[in-house]
Amino acid sequence: FKDRMKDHPVIQIQDEIGDSSWFGFSLVIRPGLGIKRSDLLNKLKDAEIECRPIVAGNFARKEVAKYLEHSVFSDLPNADYIDAMGLFIGNQHYPIPEVIVKVSDFYKDIS
């Protein structure tokens, strides 16, 4: 996955720090391309690739945050961007090379 996606023209992937469990793959649309997340979601759906929102995104804006004791020092523009332009594709317990190829190639008619 990392090898196919590291220089992707539309999608940024996470920078791994340490050893990731890779339960899934986060995908974030690169800034400045004029591509909407809804366009990306539709192309993934057409390719029969299931996806979900990134769990946290900007957690400070989630409804549950009002129940937690917390403080936010300032705006969180990166978290807002991930919340608006990111998504998550689940991994499997068996190899899925054909899905990884589909994910890395789907953008050709969206960009």
Predicted region positions:
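PLP-dependent aminotransferase class I/II
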Residues: F1-S111
